[in-house]
Amino acid sequence: MDTTPAPQPAPGADPAATPDPTPDFTPAERARGRALRRAQQPWALGARLAGLALPLLLGLTPAGAALATAVGRWFGDSRTATVLAGAAALVVLGQALQLPFGAAVRSVRVRYGLVTQGWAGWALDALRGLALTLVLVLPLVLGLFALTAWSPQHWWLPAAGAAALLTAVLSFLHPLLVEPVFNRFTPMPPGELRTALLALADRDGIRVRDVLVADASRRTTALNAYVSGLGATRRIVAYDTLLTTAEPREVELVVAHELGHVKHRDVPVGTALGAVGAAVAVAVLGLLAAWQPLLDAAGASDAADPRALPLLAALAALLGAASGPAQCAVSRRIEARADRHALELTGDAEQFVAMQRRLALANVSDVDPPRVLELLFATHPSATRRIAAARAWQAARVTRTAQGTQGRQGTEGTQGAQGTQASHSSHASQAGQAGQGRPAPEQHRTDPGKSVV
């Protein structure tokens, strides 16, 4: 594995400057990715804004309290009924508001050949997502309001610990309970590729339970692979679209990137950070929810009041939106590190570039998006940046190799010259001793791997 240090930018160079995509993508390819991004961008941004505006409208005005009270009456008007019905209403309204935006984005992607799923399948996925969200959210909300009833002032202390624990548990259970809801997984048949992927993981010192194929082609033409799970649940998952489109060596590089996440413990570290973030978020919620002006605006008496549920949802949405750019920045850094791991593990920068080009074209990516959009929303570096980083890695590797070769040649030359001098000195000494009638001592043997002093 190569240990070449990360290349440093040239003096005066701007490390944040966008690399030139011209050598790797034609004007038509760049234009196609840019056109897709511009076509779906208004709808994607609209979905984000709508997803934030709705909880703010309901949580910072009496409208949310009125909604929770009204739907609670339909189910008995008890505190528990108001909490559960209010939470369900917020989830359903939020999902319903997102549907038009999601449908518009889907229509755009259909025009670009990225969608293989019909509208019926899309609607079924939306219903599955809604059901899964309700199954996860309703018990959590019920537990939360049990804590607020226990102590309207200090509920957030045990809630913070519970949030951290649940984050860790859900991270472990996600590949077992959530992924199968949306995809079918089958073991990759025995063959050269499966053997190569398992050997790659073994060479990297990573144990995986299995190599699975996800039936992503039912929905999309996009290419992807990932490693999911922790410990006994860890497995390599490849999209069937990747296996039918990419070269085997490119598949190995995609998996090598994902193994980088495992090698650097990105999942457990991310889970730990997520757990800490969840605990901090709950603590902040506890402090804000105790502020009387906010409670008055929401039409609630205190945090134990079921009518405070929309306020808590609004504050959580604000915290999530505010932390989004920071989370994206951390994600881009992690992805860049995984790219470097793939290069070190395979040593194949040329094939890495080919793989990045294939992924960008298959996914119709904007290879050089506006920097502000990249900073705010991108979880991965752009294809242009990833290719430039791979070429910089290769250049640094070549330079290091050349320097190492020159150093070895210089050492060997020094050893040879010193050995010749020692030989001449020894012969002269032997000749002098022989002339004096004394036996010549045993000639000193020089280790060819060390310099003669």
How does the language model describe each region?
Residues 298-322:
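Generic long, charged, amphipathic alpha-helical segments
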Residues 394-442:
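Intrinsically disordered, low-complexity repeat/linker tracts enriched for polar/charged residues
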Residues 2-301, 321-404, 437-453:
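Polar-ligand-bearing catalytic/cofactor-coordination segments
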